[in-house]
From Swiss-Prot:
One of its GO terms (cellular component) is nucleus. It comes from the Eukaryota. It comes from Oryza sativa subsp. indica (Rice). Belongs to the type IV zinc-finger family. Class C subfamily. One of its GO terms (molecular function) is sequence-specific DNA binding. A zinc finger (GATA-type) spans 215-242. Pfam families: CCT (PF06203), GATA (PF00320), tify (PF06200). CDD domains: ZnF_GATA. It is found in: Nucleus. Residues 32-60 have a biased composition (Acidic residues). This is GATA transcription factor 18.
Length: 319
């Protein structure tokens, strides 16, 4: 019996649960809908806040962009004034030339020419290369000015191969050339000189050889001695032997054979010099044996008996 009562109670509870399930489900759905609605409203509010934040941040981005730097040399319009100061570019609209003139006079500047506006326009073509410099605001004004001066100087450069100075041109024209190139003295020595120069050089060489072809002491030819040396009469006046003795002892050596040979040569020359009529006008030069100095051995050999005879003669007289 108790078991049957318990089973009946369990069945009633199950029925009650089955009846209450749809109501709970409906109630749960309503709660979920309410939560979803709350979440949706929160998301909408966040989106509205984001849009408002974007709207607040957009105005600075929507501000008109800063005017591009324009050079004072390249005005956009006749009444537009552009100033460049410390890398900053300032553009002023509707500025008449009269106002600019008044400001310049107030600052103590000179009077602006009346045709300045007309003169600036042609410079636009010439100053196109300065746009990249003048449009940059990160470069100081001094740097911009120095770059402009550099570019102005670069325009004057001339890379053509030509002589620029008149002095250098004159020097180049005076210099000797060999196959179109400048030739120095060393290169010109191998080349033949002009006929006049050759004759002059030959004449001077012959005179030089005739003057200094023989030793003044012994008459030795220049070709018969290793080198001509300095003597009392100057350089290249003595042969090698005479010059060495003169340099070492300060005296000239005796050359009897050379004197005899020189006298014979002089005799032959005098015999050869005959007048056209066949009569010799020069006297015959005969070497005098007394003038020929004896050699050192002969002097030593002959002097001893002579001295003994001289010494013995007074002794004989005294006896």
């Amino acid at each position: 019996m108790p078991d049957a009562a318990a089973a009946a109670a369990a069945a009633q509870d199950a029925d009650a649960v089955m009846r209450d399930a749809p109501a709970d489900a409906a109630a749960g759905g309503g709660d979920n809908n309410d939560d979803d609605g709350d979440d949706g409203t929160e998301e909408d509010e966040e989106e509205d806040d984001d849009e408002e934040g974007d709207e607040e941040e957009l105005p600075p981005a929507e501000d008109p962009a800063a005017p591009e730097p324009v050079s004072a040399l390249l005005p956009g319009s006749p009444n537009q004034l552009t100033l460049l100061f410390q890398g900053e570019v300032y553009v002023f609209e509707s500025v008449t030339p009269e106002k600019v003139q008044a400001v310049l006079l107030l600052l103590g500047s000179c009077e602006m020419p009346p045709g300045l506006a007309n003169m600036v326009l042609p410079n636009q073509r010439e100053n196109r290369g300065y746009d990249d410099l003048l449009q940059r605001t990160d470069i100081p004004a001094k740097r911009v000015a120095s770059l402009i001066r550099f570019r102005e100087k670069r325009k004057e450069r001339n890379f053509d191969k030509k002589i620029r100075y008149a002095v250098r041109k004159e020097v180049a024209l005076r210099m000797q050339r060999r196959k179109g190139q400048f030739a120095g003295r060393a290169n010109m020595e191998g080349e033949s000189l002009s006929p006049g120069c050759e004759l002059a050089s030959q004449g001077s060489g012959q005179d030089f050889l005739s003057r200094e072809s023989k030793c003044q002491n012994c008459g030795t030819s220049e070709k018969m001695t290793p080198a001509m040396r300095r003597g009392p009469a100057g350089p290249r006046t003595l042969c090698n032997a005479c010059g060495l003795m003169w340099a070492n002892k300060g005296t000239l050596r005796n050359c009897p054979k050379a004197k005899v040979e020189s006298s014979v040569v002089a005799t032959e020359q005098s015999n050869a010099a005959v007048s056209p009529s066949g009569i010799d006008n020069k006297e015959l030069v005969v070497p005098n044996p007394e003038n020929i100095t004896a050699s050192h051995g002969e002097v030593m050999g002959d002097s001893t008996p002579a001295n003994e005879a001289e010494i013995g003669a007074p002794k004989a007289q005294s006896q």
